[in-house]
Every structure is written in C-alpha cells, then in structure tokens.
Design a protein with these regions (language model features):
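Alpha-helical scaffold elements adjacent to nucleotide-binding pockets in ATP/GTP-utilizing enzyme cores
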Residues: 142-145, 175-179
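Phosphate- and divalent-cation-binding pockets in alpha/beta enzyme and binding domains
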Residues: 141-148, 307
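Amphipathic alpha-helical transducer elements in NTP-driven molecular machines
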Residues: 117-120, 173-177, 222
Length: 400
C-alpha cells in the first residue's frame, strides 16, 4: 500500500534554543512513540515494516564510540570511520546503541562489548531478512559499524544522502536535521539539546550522555530519516530518476565492499616518503624564516601579511576578505611572485606544496594504516556535482 504522510505537527521551529534539564525532561519533551527497548525481542515483536507499493522498509541508525586503539593497532575485521572533517574529525569504531523505526514507532536498544553484543546480534532477524529493505542516512557508516560487531545486512538498502542529492542537488545542507526540517512531523530539538550538553560539559563520548537524552536523540534520527524517505522516494519516479538511484545504490554497496577490504600500504615506501617530504618541508620553512628575518607562523595569514609589509610589499597588492582580513591564498602569492618579484611568496608556495603532500599523502596514509598494513579510506560518492569520486580519511588519489 502507499504510504500516507504523517499528520504529526513539527515539534521544533528553526532557531529555537533548547537545553537539557533532567528534572523536567520527561515531562516537557517525551515523545509517545519513542521507546528504549529492553531486549532485541521487544523490537522484533513490535516492529511492522512500513510499505510502499507492497515493498517492506525499516529505517535504522547506530550511535558509536571510539576505542582507545591507535589506527595501527586496529585489528583485522574492524574498520575505523571518522565523524567530522579535517583535524577535528573524531574516530568511531563500535556501536553502543541501534535505533530502528517502522514509521509508527522508534526503538533504541543498547548493548556492550562486555556482553559480546549478544543482544544486538539477535536483531539479525530483521537485518538479515532479505524481504525487508533497510534505510539509513549515510548507510556505509552504519553498515561498517554493524559489521565491526559481525552483523550483516541482507536485502535491498537505501541511503537518504544519495536519495536527496538526486532529488535536489542544490540544497545548502545534506545533514539529516536540515533536510527533515521541511517536513511536517520532524523532531530535531534533541540534536540541539545534545550539542548544548556536549559544549557545556565538554564531553565527546556519547556513552557518557544522559541515557534519556541519547535515546530520544537516536530515535529522532531514525524518525526524521523515515520522514525524508517517504517524502523524497516518490520523487524519483516523478523526476525519472529511479533507474539512476538504483544504480547508485548498487555502486554504494560496491564502494562499501572496497572500503571494507582496504588498500594495502607499502610501509617501507611510505616511511621513506614521509622522511623525504619532512626534509623538504623543513628546508622550505627555514628558507622562509631566513628571508623574513624571524620565525613566525607560516600558516597564519595575519602574521604572513605583517611579514610581507615589513619586506616592503605594497599593501594595495594584498586583497582583503569581506571582513577586512588579508588574503594570502595561492592566487595572491602567485601574483606577488610572478608579477612583482616577491621572492618570499614563491618560497611560501613551495612550503605549502610540500607540507600538504606530507600531511595528506605521507603522514595521513602512514599514520592511519591498520594493524594489517591497510588503509580504509572513505570513498565519497556524492561530494562532487560532476560525478567525480574522491577518497578521504585518509586522503588518497582521486577516483575517476
């Protein structure tokens, strides 16, 4: 049967500020169709997959945490993923709760490594049922977390990130809360509460958060994902994109397998490359300091601007941002070097080239290798509108 869109009203308006108060939380913020499951069997007994055109679906998500292991200590069979970007990215290794939504209710189940994830594994009755299609937002991440504890997903799978990028490639954000906000019945207040609690208490490990807050946050994630799917999935037929979407899902599963297998690293070569690039970077940095006449933070636009002015560079040659800060990107430095014979500008470009190669392709790959000598990069399927794929965390060569 066709899915009828939810008539529940939105729980939060954009921009509303929420904070977690344990004394009033349940009274003010409880959601009657959100539950913490006491056992896997409770979910199995109560879940009735929602249907679209006779096809059965459920939505799932995982909440995860990092182990204390360094990347080169990660054992075979466990693939580390990362949350966030750049240097602020946090490693994630194992799930501590799994949430499932059937369009009417959402359940969150907790389990631990000490219990050998025996309760989670009982959910195989759902995850390994090929007649039930499984939906997630950033499916590969959650699939890795499940396989890290020897759980498998069988049957067709769906990713609302890929789905929503096909239905509208010009969205300003593909975060779940931002996509779901346009649909009646969305619930995003718990994410704001979680962020506020994280900032106030300086806690990054979600296992340390109040249980009721995590449960509602996790249940809201699968509920919002459900809303996005039932509203956006029909658009594939409307826009003539269903065949393309199905191809993208097959590709996603293949990319997941490639991530899982990993890329073997020549450790001897990487170690030699790391040493050579470190020497080139250090020499380039020393040459900059020698011409500047002092040591400064080469990566600081403000400090670099001051050095350029002290060396006699005309202030009018250095453009500003809209906020008035000096710009010292490669285009500005190339112009100073080629058109105005500013020799230190070329030295800075050389330093940046070697430093990027060092941190990205030598240190990044060498330091993130697993115990079996492989790197398990994240293959980005939807980052570029041109269709080009890339591999990050650690960065590897661009994929055609």
């Amino acid at each position: 049967m066709a899915v009828i869109k939810s008539k529940r009203r939105s729980v939060i308006k954009k921009g509303t500020n929420f904070s977690y108060n344990p004394e009033s939380f349940n009274k003010e913020h409880s959601v009657d169709f959100f539950h913490e499951a006491k056992s896997a069997q409770e979910i199995i007994d109560n879940m009735v997959p929602f249907e679209i055109n006779g096809r059965k679906f459920i939505v799932f998500d995982t909440e995860t945490y990092p182990t204390p292991l360094k990347s080169n200590e990660i054992p075979n069979g466990l693939v580390r993923r990362w949350v966030g970007s750049g240097k602020s990215a946090k490693p994630q290794d194992l799930p501590f709760c799994i949430s499932i939504c059937d369009g009417k209710s959402a359940y969150t189940l907790h389990d631990t490594l000490d219990n050998n994830y025996n309760e989670f594994r009982k959910l195989a009755a759902i995850f390994e049922d090929p007649s039930i299609e499984k939906i997630a937002h950033n499916w590969k991440f959650d699939a890795h977390m499940l396989q890290n504890i020897n759980m498998r997903i069988k049957g067709k799978v769906h990713d609302t990130v890929v789905l929503t990028k096909l239905t509208d490639e010009n969205r300003s954000s593909y975060q779940l809360k931002d996509i779901a906000r346009k649909y009646e019945g969305h619930i995003v207040k718990f994410e704001y509460m979680l962020d506020a609690y994280k900032n106030t208490h300086k806690i990054a490990d979600y296992r340390m958060f109040p249980r009721e807050l995590i449960n509602n946050y996790a249940n809201a994630d699968v509920w919002n994902c459900y809303l996005v799917f039932i509203n956006e999935f029909p658009l594939l037929e409307k826009y003539g994109l269903m065949s393309l979407y199905e191809n993208e899902m097959e590709l996603m599963v293949a990319l997941y397998a490639a991530e899982r297998y990993g890329m073997k690293v020549d450790l001897d070569y990487e170690k030699q490359l790391k040493t050579e690039l470190q020497t080139l970077t250090d020499n380039a940095e020393a040459a900059i300091y020698e011409e500047a006449g002092k040591i400064f933070n080469v990566n600081s636009s403000k400090q670099l601007y001051e050095v350029l002015i002290n060396l006699g560079v005309d202030d009018r040659l250095i453009p500003r941002t809209d906020k008035g800060s000096p710009q010292t990107n490669k285009y500005v430095l190339s112009d100073l070097s080629e058109k105005h014979n500013v020799t230190i500008a070329n030295k800075i470009l050389e330093y940046r080239k070697y430093e990027k190669l060092l941190t990205t392709y030598a240190v990044g790959i060498y330091d993130q290798r697993s115990a079996e000598g492989k790197v398990h990069g994240n293959i980005n399927q939807t980052e570029a509108t041109t269709g080009r794929m890339s591999i990050t965390k650690p960065a590897q060569r661009r994929a055609a």
